[in-house]
A protein has these predicted regions:
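Anion-recognition interface
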Residues: 1-281
Length: 281
């Protein structure tokens, strides 16, 4: 049995375009990415030790004939919480190409908080409390710390930075740049290139009424007889919208103090304009 391992990784950051890019890249005929977007194999010690390399390699077997084989565990960039990810990447995949998606810090934090509400992460429901106490919101936004850690293992030429705003504004250019970086035909254009995926603004939160109905026999019948558009209508009515984040001046200043130096470091290391995110530095 031929052993197939990835030769590129989308390392994060969450809520910075990783799902959109994963969706688009896996449509390319010379690229394979498994249906499981985020294996978390190299970051989470429990998965690494219990599942083992045979499980991980099975994910990529269908891509044996593809030039580029990759995965998109967005937590790999969170080097403060998952330091083993960069170590394992450097040890087992020294020639891999890394794509690092980043987003304006305040926007990424807000979007990540909304995603956590939808997925019911155990964190304070109040936005300000969550930002101050749920470490992943801030630590996933320490772009400078993360890039510095990866540059200690990989040369800069093997790391490609993707800006969320540029992916949104000029997807053809950004997508083509990623294809060139991965060494595959850059002329391929997916039919849905301009459509964003996994938008927090489109998400809604499960309510007790929705959960109760979801498990009931009328719901099982409805799933069989109702057309998809009508099912989506009822689901949307039974779920509640995600709350809006409230940025008080005090909270904004707290985040600025936490991330300002790190953001400056990232912009310098990445070779980006120091005024790219003026609100955060």
């Amino acid at each position: 049995m031929q052993r197939v391992r990835p030769n590129f990784f989308i390392i994060g950051a969450a809520k910075a375009g990783t799902t959109t890019l994963w969706h688009l890249l896996r449509q390319h005929p010379d690229i394979f990415m498994p249906e499981l977007k985020e294996p978390w194999f190299l970051s989470h010690d429990d998965r690494y030790e219990k599942l083992g390399w045979s499980w991980y390699e099975r994910l990529f077997r269908p891509g044996a004939n593809c030039a580029a084989v990759g995965e998109a565990s967005s937590c790999y960039c969170v080097t403060r919480l998952y330091p083993n990810a960069v170590r394992r990447l450097g040890r087992y995949f020294p020639d891999a190409r890394l794509i690092y998606c980043v987003r304006e810090p305040y926007a990424r934090i807000e979007s990540a908080w909304k995603q956590c509400l939808v997925t019911q992460h155990p964190m304070p429901p109040d936005f300000a409390d969550a930002v101050r106490t749920y470490k992943l919101l801030i630590d996933s936004t320490r772009y400078g710390e993360s890039l510095q850690a990866f540059l200690g293992v990989f040369p800069r030429s093997q790391i490609h930075i993707v800006l969320f705003d540029e992916l949104s504004r000029t997807p053809v250019t950004v997508y083509g740049g990623c294809l060139e970086f991965l060494g595959v035909d850059p002329s391929f254009v997916p039919s849905d290139l301009t459509e964003s995926k996994n938008r927090s603004a489109d998400k809604r939160i499960d309510t007790p009424a929705y959960l109760a109905l979801k498990r009931s026999w009328p719901a099982r019948i409805g799933r069989r007889i109702l057309p998809p558009t009508m099912r989506k209508f009822f689901v949307r009515k039974l779920k509640q919208p995600v709350a809006e984040a409230v940025w008080t001046p005090e909270l904004r200043e707290w985040v600025r103090n936490a991330l300002e130096d790190d953001t400056r470091q990232f912009l310098q290391l990445a070779g980006l304009d120091r005024d790219l995110w003026t609100s955060a530095v």
